[in-house]
């Protein structure tokens, strides 16, 4: 039985971890995940999906704010793991830790060398890519630059957003890891170096990127909304208040960027740099997420054709 240390945080990671837990060839000695966070207006404490799964299986849990130089680092190095598996962990691994095990493998949600970094799925959708994928790669000190063990891809549909694509890629990543790991560990599967000259990067989404630019073409704004749903969520401004936009549809029409060009009891169409978008699901400041119909019956009832949002 191969003894593993698992490191990850979101549901993507938990899906991969569950695959390893269900496989009798592997024993998970411990998991390392991000610390619990206070979320929402009530500041409720939320544990990570990886921690929740580890609790259910009685696995030792380590949650350092920063792994390097921590007491937790000393403890996990003493577990005697054969190898490390990471998936969307969110921290760099110290070289001393990588050197302490026989192998260290990362499950990365992009077709490397494209989209190294923390937000590959967001950028794949925002950039209008036709496919996304997962790469199983060896871990080295440089971010997502290790040799590639295996790859798998899937189409990005017009109906996909970050949430749906995360779910698809988590399953693909789980299966790809379980399929390729035995051959990799036996030496039958030889890793392939990345072409570093082709590397692109997907840094974590900044607050500035969440704001919609209505001067962009409608397809670009549409992709941007999908690439922010369900987190961190794209927004615009209405009378100085933030209006989050979760869903929209491509529409026809002309007008100034951000201008209301159609308003009925059931629809609100906003002009972009070319074409337009029909808003479907929004969230006004201080309110719950709602359909555009509910919005137009409430806060949005004051909007008129010709008004401009986003200022």
Swiss-Prot record:
Q: Which PROSITE patterns match?
A: GART
**Which molecular-function annotations from GO does this UniProt entry contain?**
methionyl-tRNA formyltransferase activity
Could you confirm whether the keyword Transferase appears in this record? yes
One GO cellular component term? cytosol
A Pfam family that the UniProt record links to this protein? Formyl_trans_C
The answer on whether this UniProt entry bears the keyword Transferase reads yes
List the keywords (alphabetical): Protein biosynthesis, Transferase
Q: What InterPro entries does the database record attribute to this sequence?
A: Fmt, Formyl_trans_C, Formyl_trans_C_sf, Formyl_transf_N, Formyl_transf_N_sf, Formyl_transferase-like_C_sf, GART_AS, Met-tRNA-FMT_C
Report the family membership: Belongs to the Fmt family.
Which protein, by its recorded name, is this? Methionyl-tRNA formyltransferase
- Provide the species name: Streptococcus pyogenes serotype M3 (strain ATCC BAA-595 / MGAS315)
């Amino acid at each position: 039985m191969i003894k593993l240390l698992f490191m990850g945080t979101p549901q993507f990671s938990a899906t991969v971890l569950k695959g390893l837990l269900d496989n009798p060839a592997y024993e998970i000695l411990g998991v390392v995940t991000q610390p619990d966070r206070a979320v929402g207006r009530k500041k409720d404490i939320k544990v990570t999906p990886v921690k929740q799964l580890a609790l259910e299986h009685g696995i030792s849990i380590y949650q350092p704010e920063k792994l390097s130089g921590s007491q937790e680092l000393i403890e996990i190095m003493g577990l005697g793991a054969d190898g490390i598996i990471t998936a969307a962990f969110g921290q760099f691994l110290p070289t001393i830790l990588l050197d302490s095990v026989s192998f260290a493998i990362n499950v990365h949600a992009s077709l490397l060398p494209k989209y190294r970094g923390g937000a590959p799925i967001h950028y794949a959708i925002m950039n209008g890519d036709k496919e996304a994928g997962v790469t199983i790669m060896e871990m080295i000190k440089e971010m997502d630059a290790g040799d590639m063990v295996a790859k798998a891809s899937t189409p990005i549909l017009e109906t996909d957003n970050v949430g749906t694509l995360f779910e698809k890629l988590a399953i693909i990543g789980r299966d790809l890891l379980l399929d390729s790991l035995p051959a990799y560990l036996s030496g039958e599967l030889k890793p392939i170096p990345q072409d570093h000259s082709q590397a692109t990067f997907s840094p974590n989404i900044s607050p500035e990127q969440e704001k919609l630019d209505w001067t962009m073409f409608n397809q670009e704004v549409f992709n941007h909304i999908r690439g922010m749903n369900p987190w961190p969520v794209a927004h615009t401004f209405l009378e100085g208040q933030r209006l989050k936009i979760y869903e929209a549809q491509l529409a026809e029409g002309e007008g100034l960027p951000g201008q209301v060009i159609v308003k009925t009891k059931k629809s609100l169409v906003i002009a972009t740099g070319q074409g337009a978008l029909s808003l479907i699901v929004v969230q006004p400041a201080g309110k719950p997420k709602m359909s555009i119909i509910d919005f137009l019956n409430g806060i949005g009832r004051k909007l008129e054709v010709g008004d401009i949002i986003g200022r």
